[in-house]
């Protein structure tokens, strides 16, 4: 090797040595600008608060949400373009597994993750409760079932609803008559959805209830019991959620009204010791029944609500509410239609007037149908011919229809305890015991009026004007209703005139609400759905009436 070649080889060796030294130095002391912090071992705890964030990103003591920062930075924390080519593998969604579980320990052994805090607080008002809590309610209706997953925080004496997750499926439990196991399995999509939305460490202390409506009764008592038993066994064997006392059952109509009242007053902030406004009344119009719940206020200290099935004393968050409640079975919208049709049919047969024989059918003028409408009576008495109801040929301004609806209320029926509403049922008068607080109308009340462009606040006089417009027929609709959907609904539903006039009669004659009293209707408050489910879930969190314990189990 020549001297020149030896010199070149020595230079290469020196450069390699210097490179090795530089790499070793950097790895030992860290990159410029970084602290001399050893990497944590597998036994060290990692704390979010140890992460150094840019100045101004959070205030002292503020909980940092790394995924959803409250304030946007002037410049992104990371470059939008990767420094090096990155291949990302996106995992596909897999079904939620249902672990088989067996009880092993007491509820006191449950621990909750402190990393799952609320935006409102990091420590619960009551140390025995977690900051965040979940409640699951399955509403098993006749046509389908739906699950509500409610997320609460316990930052204050009363739980605060933070978020609601919702999913609906069809058909309902009653469609599985003769197949109880199939009925139970039909709820799996809802239960798996709940598993996805409740963090794993909270599932065993997240109570669940399955409440079927009266539609399940139509399958027969033994069939309904078999379905409910199978649903309960499925929950106990395949899911971690604790079941509340009487948690898998048919919901009584009276409790539907109570829970709906709790829901609306909770969302309006009129419940609890810090409430600054009086509670509101709630009227719920379903298909088979209608419920009324309100808190009467008597002028004299010596007066109070008389004892009876209508009286319900509610304990909520240390406050006691003495409520009037009643569920009028058979006076829901669909049942009221049948009742009014029966009145019209019987009246026509008795008088033999307005009867026209049209081949194999009998035509009867029906004052509760809009102008020139026709409707085949679904319960025609004669097997030889069907009954066709037809609307009047001249506008009648709804008065005749309301007269029939008022007769269906049996206002003059004997009433043992006065004052009374209708059909012999006791009820304190609104004009004496509930003079100025709001009245909320929900369910079919909302559906029938809002879809026609009615504002959310109105009077019975406004309802009468709307009913007159609807009953006047298609020629008048073009000028009265500008909404395309409203016109479509009116054309497809000949009983809309009947529905509105029945509602007017129910409110003004049945419940005796003054025509100029302001009424409110809504489907949601603060983007939370109205109805009985939220109220029932709040009841499940009540210390006095919870009827459940944490379901502390382990996988086997």
UniProtKB/Swiss-Prot annotation:
Residues 1-12 are cytoplasmic. It is found in: Golgi apparatus membrane. One of its GO terms (biological process) is protein N-linked glycosylation via asparagine. The gene is gdp1. GO terms for cellular component: endoplasmic reticulum; Golgi apparatus; Golgi membrane; membrane. It comes from the Eukaryota. Its EC number is 3.6.1.42. Belongs to the GDA1/CD39 NTPase family. Keywords: Calcium, Glycoprotein, Golgi apparatus, Hydrolase, Manganese, Membrane, Metal-binding, Signal-anchor, Transmembrane, Transmembrane helix. One of its GO terms (molecular function) is ribonucleoside triphosphate phosphatase activity. Its cofactor is Ca(2+); Mn(2+). Pathway: Protein modification; protein glycosylation. Disulfide bonds: none annotated. The chain crosses the membrane at residues 13-33. This is Guanosine-diphosphatase. Residues 34-556 are lumenal. InterPro entries: GDA1_CD39_NTPase. After transfer of sugars to endogenous macromolecular acceptors, the enzyme converts nucleoside diphosphates to nucleoside monophosphates which in turn exit the Golgi lumen in a coupled antiporter reaction, allowing entry of additional nucleotide sugar from the cytosol. Pfam families: GDA1_CD39. The active site is at 256 (proton acceptor).
